[in-house]
Amino acid sequence: MQDSSIKLGIVVAEFNYDITHLMLDRAISHAKFLNAEVRAVFKVPGTFEIPLAVKQLLSRDDIDCVVTLGAVIKGETKHDEVIANQVARLVSDLSLEFNKPVSLGIIGPGATHEQAMERIEEYSTRAVESAVKMARRMRSMMEGSSSVNIE
């Protein structure tokens, strides 16, 4: 099972680039550490555009899972909450529609720029870890494993 590498796609928002480009670097590095292959990196203007890119990647046969990366920084209005909540809902729906894992590596809502900088490593690596683990476990279940406690 683990001989066959998990192939993942990464969707990263360019908005708040000082944060998201570091998230992308950490995510790619962690994927290599987990022996997962990054097949595609799809850069989108902002977090709002992430679901469409996720849908495109999930439709590909060479993608087992998708990692989303972004930073939704708190502003003067509730715009950050609306964006983050809608994106989370849509990527979750896409995961169910395509029966492939999609992890949420989006910092926010409500995060300050300083908080987002502090969370780069955690959010990036956890998102990759989650997607790869789920893809491996789903692959094992599809191959006939009777255990739900698959490592």
UniProtKB/Swiss-Prot annotation:
Give the Gene Ontology MF terms in alphabetical order.
6,7-dimethyl-8-ribityllumazine synthase activity
Q: Does the keyword Transferase apply?
A: yes
Instruction: Give binding positions for 5-amino-6-(D-ribitylamino)uracil.
Output: F15, T47, F48, E49, A71, V72, I73, L104
In the Enzyme Commission scheme, what number(s) does this protein have?
A: 2.5.1.78
Q: Name one GO biological process term.
A: riboflavin biosynthetic process
Alphabetic keyword roster:
Riboflavin biosynthesis, Transferase
Q: What class of enzyme is it?
A: transferase
Q: In which pathway does it act?
A: Cofactor biosynthesis; riboflavin biosynthesis; riboflavin from 2-hydroxy-3-oxobutyl phosphate and 5-amino-6-(D-ribitylamino)uracil: step 1/2
Under InterPro entries, the record lists: LS, LS/RS, LS/RS_sf
| GO CC entries | riboflavin synthase complex
Q: What does this protein do?
A: Catalyzes the formation of 6,7-dimethyl-8-ribityllumazine by condensation of 5-amino-6-(D-ribitylamino)uracil with 3,4-dihydroxy-2-butanone 4-phosphate. This is the penultimate step in the biosynthesis of riboflavin.
This protein's name? 6,7-dimethyl-8-ribityllumazine synthase
Report the source organism: Metallosphaera sedula (strain ATCC 51363 / DSM 5348 / JCM 9185 / NBRC 15509 / TH2)
Q: Which gene encodes it?
A: ribH
